[in-house]
Amino acid sequence: MQAASSPVVIVTQPGVGSGPAPQNSNWQTGLCDCFSDCGVCLCGTFCFTCLACQVASDMNECCLCGTSVAMRTLYRTRYGIPGSICDDFMVTHCCPLCSLCQIKRDINRRRANRTF
């Protein structure tokens, strides 16, 4: 006869707080700072979908309609940029072009600084 095995109890579970805390930082450019990178602004103005897919690809996310709030929130929390989901919602719904261009400019600058 075999002895009954004891169930395994998980005491700590990995989750959101298990990784290193992001460093606090700010956006590299302002929301309406279009002239700091005219190429990004022109791309967003004339081919918004292309820019949205490019940003999603940069973040290793899928390019689906309606994910802009989630991507902005993910990006902001990943880099410790202050704000809230409510802020992200308002920015992406009131000015989706400015929001998307700001994320792309930020990605480009962080890449140039090798912090992306």
From Swiss-Prot:
* Signal sequence region: none
Q: Name one Pfam family in it.
A: PLAC8
Q: Which GO terms describe its biological process?
A: positive regulation of transcription by RNA polymerase II
**What InterPro entries does this protein map onto?**
PLAC_motif_containing (IPR006461)
Q: Which family does it belong to?
A: Belongs to the cornifelin family.
- Protein known as: Placenta-specific gene 8 protein
Q: Which organism is it from?
A: Bos taurus
